[in-house]
Amino acid sequence: KDVAVTIEQNSVIARHPSGESVTVTFTPDVALTQTGNNYTALVHSPKHPVHVAISFFTSEKEMTAGLQNIPTLLNNPEKALQANAERWEGYLAKILRKDMKPEYDRIAVKAVTTLISNWRTHRGGLLHEGIVPSHAVGYFVGFWAWDSWRFSAGTAKFDPELAKNNIRAMFDYQQPDGMVIDCIYTDPSENNARDSKPPLVCWAVDEIFTHTGDTAFVSEMYPQLLSYYKWWYDKRDHNRNGMCEYGST
């Protein structure tokens, strides 16, 4: 009910009070009409496939710039579709194995599809791109610590830059004492600095190094990782037996 729908030129625009928007852009031969928050798109004499561009923007400024690029895309949709197909084939070429059974390949494809579909750009309080755990409920649409470590370990093989940035996003909010907090959001007031999650991040960094050999990234992360692990033994080994616990502060 908070979303405002308008038709502007060949685009249907749904604006959210947060500043985010979703646009559906048609070619000029499609007639658009609006009734309330509903719209109708009518093709009078379809002689060829109708292509539509669906876009998500995080601000009005971003939307204005993005919509200017869409006519070029719709004038040559085959080029964009080919680039998209090559992008996905590039992901899969890095994870599918000839020694895997077909049923395992299907699971691998599903895993890649889920990770990439949950990929979100940097915006607001999220200073780097990353992957959200789920869209099932609103509080999952943020970055969570141990989810991010696993996501980064998983994407290291087929999109290492995304894997690196997902880790950086969590360490953007590392506390002065070394703690990496539970979860972060576009609105930092919703961040949870009360809880911690198991420290799987060195595994994720090692996976990135294994697949890229990027020593610069390891050097970048090392001081933060060391501070993080010192925090665990200072603040989470309550009985000083060398085994850390996790929970709330």
Task: Please tell me what each predicted stretch does.
Residues 1-141, 215-233:
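Acidic/polar, glycine-enriched structural segments that form the non-catalytic walls/loops
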Residues 141-249:
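Aromatic-rich carbohydrate-recognition surfaces in CAZymes
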